[in-house]
Amino acid sequence: MGRGRVELKRIEGKINRQVTFAKRRNGLLKKAYELSVLCDAEVALIIFSNRGKLYEFCSSSSMLKTLERYQKCNYGAPEPNISTREALEISSQQEYLKLKGRYEALQRSQRNLLGEDLGPLNSKELESLERQLDMSLKQIRSTRTQLMLDQLTDYQRKEHALNEANRTLKQRLMEGSQLNLQCSQMHKLWAMAGKQLKLRAMASFILWIVNLLCKLGIRMIQLQ
């Protein structure tokens, strides 16, 4: 049973794509070298990766000479009147036209997303536009929901912090009230103690006066 035909399409995985590129590139360069050696052919191979890196092989001493030979055989000799500056101007003009086309396409897409200029669109384009709008709405809803959840979490955190601060303040106020009560009781005790000391001092003084008067009275009686 023969091998089935493999469908050629772009490899989606970036790593797999790079690995496949490296293997196929090396194989292609090897085949070009073998062809030039086995058949004594002049072979030139130019490869640019998707990142713009150049890989080349040339069986002759100069890639430029091989390219000039290729141009003579297929396109004729290059026009001598076209200077490097003119070539750059042409390249810049082409790049400008590409950018202009992309800009106009983006403008049309933006107008279509806003519901404008829908007349020229066919059914498939309208379906694609509808899918884009649905995806945009889903993304907007998801972003809005996440924003509301973040705000709710922030409010809960602030509420918890305020409750903690309120409890701490109440505890300090209670401690302050108890301290004031203790201080008031201490003042009362000191006041009572002071009064008692004063009364004792006055009682001692009065007793001393009474004793003194008694002694004086006894002497006066004796003198009489």
UniProtKB/Swiss-Prot annotation:
Subcellular localization(s) per the UniProt record: Nucleus
Keyword entries, A-Z: DNA-binding, Nucleus, Transcription, Transcription regulation
Record GO terms (molecular function): DNA-binding transcription factor activity, RNA polymerase II-specific; protein dimerization activity; RNA polymerase II cis-regulatory region sequence-specific DNA binding
Gene Ontology biological-process entries: positive regulation of transcription by RNA polymerase II; regulation of transcription by RNA polymerase II
Coiled coil: none
Pfam families attached to this UniProt entry: K-box, SRF-TF
Principal subcellular localisation of the protein: nucleus
Expression by tissue: Flower specific.
Domain K-box positions: 89-179
InterPro entries hit by this protein: MADS-box/MEF2_TF, MEF2-like_N, TF_Kbox, TF_MADSbox, TF_MADSbox_sf
Gene Ontology cellular component annotations, sorted alphabetically: nucleus
MADS-box domain mapped to chain residues: 3-57
Role of this protein: Probable transcription factor active in inflorescence development and floral organogenesis.
Protein's name according to its UniProt entry: Agamous-like MADS-box protein AGL9 homolog
Lineage start: Eukaryota, Viridiplantae, Streptophyta, Embryophyta, Tracheophyta
